[in-house]
């Protein structure tokens, strides 16, 4: 007896090797087990047998043949993985909707809200709110746990997200993210003062070798020919908006959208996001309630109508209140 698990590749994992994707999708699975399954033909990619060296595209469909757990074997209980006891339920949570039509909606996510359910976060997420607001009219090709979610921002990051109401719209938006045609602008306040008024950070990001729960710039993954192996290419453009004593107000544009990208890149330059308890200083000069990072603007092509759309959100109170406490830096 066996089960098949259906997986859809999200935009942020486009370009990833299939064995690494499987390992991240199924934490119980080791890399060697994933490669074994691929060698045994247990994984299909878009309807054809997958190869162990295949790299994935956003929206690609994986079908994984999972063995049934047998007492005495070391295989995890895949039945529990496939059919968890609970799935996200609709919850009447207020949404700040910036735009909505029959195919998609753009929401302004508040700080402290998790985007989708995960370990320790089964309620109060954006997905729970979307399930209440949209009901059955929500893209589910990426699973009910990520219903409607096209891209993510961190729990303690506020700002704009586009969500898909149907699978066709999801795939159209995911393709734009993969092709870097979605405009994503953030504003942040960082510790310290960047030397240049504007610049580009082009450094690969992967799991930290010191702490697997964190991300890090991985220069060791850069190959002589300029390609990246074992991490993911990440590009962040920044512009200084104003300098303060001990802090800098920045506008950032994402060319790629890797996990914690802005936070990791700026921390690597020695200017971590103010209030970032993961990548910031252990003893910051100012204590904040979470990180000062806001997804300020979002632009994309409507996946159905073809119209180019652009949205902006005001800086939230926590951000502007912090700015008012800072002392502008005198020009040298």
Residue spans of the language-model regions?
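RNA pseudouridine synthases
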Residues: 1-332
């Amino acid at each position: 007896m066996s089960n098949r698990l259906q997986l859809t590749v999200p935009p942020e994992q486009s370009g990833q090797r299939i064995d690494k994707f499987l390992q991240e999708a199924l934490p119980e699975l080791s890399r060697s087990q994933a490669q074994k399954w691929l060698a045994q033909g247990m994984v299909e990619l878009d309807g054809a047998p997958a190869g162990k060296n295949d790299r994935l595209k956003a929206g690609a469909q994986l079908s994984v043949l999972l063995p049934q757990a047998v007492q005495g074997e070391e295989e995890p209980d895949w039945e529990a993985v496939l059919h968890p006891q609970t799935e996200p339920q609709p919850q009447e949570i207020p949404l700040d909707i910036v735009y909505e039509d029959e195919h998609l909606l753009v929401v302004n996510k508040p700080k402290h809200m998790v985007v989708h359910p995960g370990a320790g976060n089964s309620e109060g997420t954006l997905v729970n709110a979307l399930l209440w607001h949209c009901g059955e009219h929500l893209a589910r090709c990426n699973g009910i746990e990520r219903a409607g979610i096209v891209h993510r921002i961190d729990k303690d990051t506020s700002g704009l997200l586009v969500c898909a109401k149907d699978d066709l719209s999801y795939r159209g938006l995911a393709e734009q993210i993969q092709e870097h045609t979605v405009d994503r602008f953030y504003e942040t306040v960082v510790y310290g003062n960047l030397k240049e008024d504007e610049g580009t950070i082009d450094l690969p990001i992967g799991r930290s070798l010191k702490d697997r729960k964190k991300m890090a710039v991985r220069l060791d993954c850069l190959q002589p020919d300029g390609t990246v192996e074992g991490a993911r290419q990440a590009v962040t453009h920044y512009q200084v908006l104003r300098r303060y004593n001990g802090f800098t107000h920045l506008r950032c544009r994402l060319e790629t959208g890797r996990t914690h990208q802005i936070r990791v890149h700026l921390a690597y330059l020695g200017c971590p996001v103010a209030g970032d308890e993961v990548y910031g200083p252990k003893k910051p000069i100012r204590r904040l309630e979470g990180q000062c990072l806001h997804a300020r603007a979002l632009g994309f092509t409507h996946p159905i109508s073809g119209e180019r759309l652009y949205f902006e959100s005001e800086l939230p109170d926590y951000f502007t209140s912090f700015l008012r406490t800072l002392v502008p830096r005198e020009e040298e």
